A protein has these predicted regions:
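N-terminal capping/small domains of soluble enzymes
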Residues: 1-72, 113, 121
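Structural preference for beta-strand elements that scaffold enzyme active sites
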Residues: 23, 66-70, 131-133, 182-186
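Active-site-proximal loop/turn and secondary-structure-junction residues that shape catalytic pockets
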Residues: 30, 73-75, 136-138
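Aromatic- and acidic-residue-enriched carbohydrate-binding clefts of CAZyme catalytic domains
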Residues: 31, 44, 79-105, 145-165
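Alpha-helical scaffolding segments of alpha/beta enzyme cores, especially the outer helices
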Residues: 55-58, 119, 170-177
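Non-globular sequence segments
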Residues: 58, 66, 72-129
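Generic beta-strand/beta-sheet core signal
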Residues: 70, 135-137, 143
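Active-site neighborhood of glycoside hydrolase catalytic domains
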Residues: 158-185
Length: 186
């Protein structure tokens, strides 16, 4: 529940490497304490996650696998029951009865989230992984920025496709500026 990697997850992925998988990508790992999409999910939002990540990266490398950690934020799909707060989204979202189910992100929060993705990538690199996969599908936060129904913003992060893409672009640029040249970003 605290995002620390379990022995079962390490064993499961290491077994894939021992079986000859050349590239191993972890399950989605939340970059923010309040971005968890489901119970028991792996986290990369705190330095306390680095020891477990290091153990996994070492075991995968010892079995000749390239290793990536998939990073994401659940956005409006981060249940309030798990995160103790109303979910966030590029724009406010309401259910059919008009109840707010996700609140709109402030610009300062968007910048904080870009930093969360960047810091998560740094933790992944410090742990010894070969790279990250930025999860931008399945209606999670990045996908919500790209969508016209979930992103009705009137600022630099909304409107045109170029603006809706800006959140992901800013994440990639920010990460690339701080990780090593050979660190993979997919």
């Amino acid at each position: 529940e605290d995002g620390v990697l379990s022995e079962a997850e390490i064993t499961w992925l290491t077994r894939r490497a021992k079986d000859g998988f050349g590239v191993i990508t972890t399950a989605a790992s939340h970059v923010s304490e309040h971005g968890k999409g489901w119970s028991g999910e792996m986290g990369v939002w705190d330095d306390s996650h680095i020891p477990g990540l290091t153990k996994m990266a070492t075991q995968l490398r010892e079995n000749d696998s390239i290793s990536l950690v998939q990073i994401f934020h659940g956005g409006m799909k981060a249940p309030s029951e798990l995160n103790d707060r109303i979910p966030v989204c590029p724009s406010e979202m309401k259910d059919n009865e008009g109840k707010i189910v996700a609140r709109e992100l402030e610009l300062s929060e968007i910048n904080d989230l870009i930093n969360d993705f960047t810091n998560a990538a740094l933790r992944v690199e410090k742990a010894g992984f070969d790279g990250i996969e930025i999860h931008g599908a399945h209606s999670y936060l990045i996908s919500q920025f790209l969508g016209v129904k979930t992103n009705r913003r009137n600022d630099q992060y909304g409107g045109s496709i170029e603006n809706r893409f800006r959140f992901l672009k800013d994440i990639i640029i920010s990460i690339r500026e701080v990780v090593s040249k050979n660190f993979l970003i997919s």
